[in-house]
Amino acid sequence: CSKTFNATTGTPLSRLRDKERFEGYADCVRQGLSVRASAAKVGVTVDKAFRWRHRFLQSVVSQQPKGVAGMLEVDETYFRESQKGSRKLTRPARYRGGRAKGAGRKAADWVPVLVGRVRGQPYTVDKVLTRLNGAEVTAALKDAVKPGETVVCTDGHSAFLRLDKSLGVETRYFVAGYHGHTNKTFHVQTANNYHEQLKTWIQRGLRGVATKYLPNYLAWHRLMTWNKAGLTS
């Protein structure tokens, strides 16, 4: 092929300087340390620590559970579109987290995020979507489910209504307005609880993140839940 490669090609270590410090930095990411705390701990600049953060997290984005067995609760949530850190904005700036111009929730101002949580297990499926529709939901979940072993439980959104056919799995739907506010077996409370934890961490802990980095931060939160559950070393 007339090309050279080595063991680090295609990994976060490819063409990386100070490789001997990266393992220690990866441990800082697993612990959820800030950029400044991580930089001080491993002895690199704050700018390099930020670049390393996203170099590492990009490799975690695709590390999602596959062929899960059990109840997979699936629900969507939304994050306000953010151009944080951009030198040129494509829209008027918002100050102090103010509301976007225009009445109501314009689709262009919000980014849909799909979250699936395996009930009773520390496994999470997450995906930033361009639109919440059946095709994108199916693409996001197709590797996570296993026909005959996965039961998908969702709310009544139209994007979820044909998952039984598109994924070939058993589905259950829970609509609070129709079924009441509680159902001990079929519900999406585990997914909603994860939404709350995720939003609190991003909005309060990180003071918001740029939309272009949102997949990386979803992966980071997932990595920290693995670390808490003892699934990382």
Language-model-derived ranges and their functions:
Residues 1-233:
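Residue-level recognition of single "structural anchor" positions
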